[in-house]
């Protein structure tokens, strides 16, 4: 966990271009922290005053962009929970990486035979039930095999038994439109 100096920028739920200031920055945020676990959760927590200029605009499913640490580019998170504290006059905002939307997609049936993770990722993208504009990249050069049936793409990459992380090892890194396996 790392405290964030930059204030999150608020965007509408259906935004696709984040090269602007959206609805504005949550400059009055009292707390902003990104939590990222290796091959696991990637979430943003914000405490914002009810007197803040954007309080009335904040709702579930909206997007927040913030620099998650001192090294990575700003990342987009989707709000999934708002908890109002009427005594403190604040709202606690919880948001998860936008890439979690991939759990709503599915690989029906795909056998990966003696291939690299990059080839497996390319095949996975081709076999998704719904098209995606996410890119999947790996620099691991070893070959192995696995089989996926009715699994979402995030589970294929870093889930339990048979995932690429399980079969090849490595670590995932999430970008706004790219997931890397190193």
Task: Give, region by region, the residue ranges found by the protein language model.
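Juxtamembrane "anchor/assembly" segments of surface/extracellular structural proteins
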Residues: 1-57, 96-102, 117
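Short, acidic/charged, Gly/Pro-enriched secondary-structure junctions
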Residues: 2-17, 49-85, 111-133, 162, ...
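Hydrophobic beta-strand residues in large extracellular and virion-surface proteins
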Residues: 8, 44-46, 64-66, 79, ...
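Short, exposed beta-strand/loop patches in secreted or surface proteins that constitute
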Residues: 32-37, 80-84, 171-173
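Envelope-exposed proteins and targeting segments
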Residues: 42, 75, 89-91, 177
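Short, solvent-exposed secondary-structure boundary/capping segments
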Residues: 45, 81-98
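Short acidic, gly/pro-rich beta-turn/loop elements at beta-sheet edges
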Residues: 56-58, 87-89, 103-105
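Charged- and aromatic-enriched interaction segments used to assemble
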Residues: 96-182
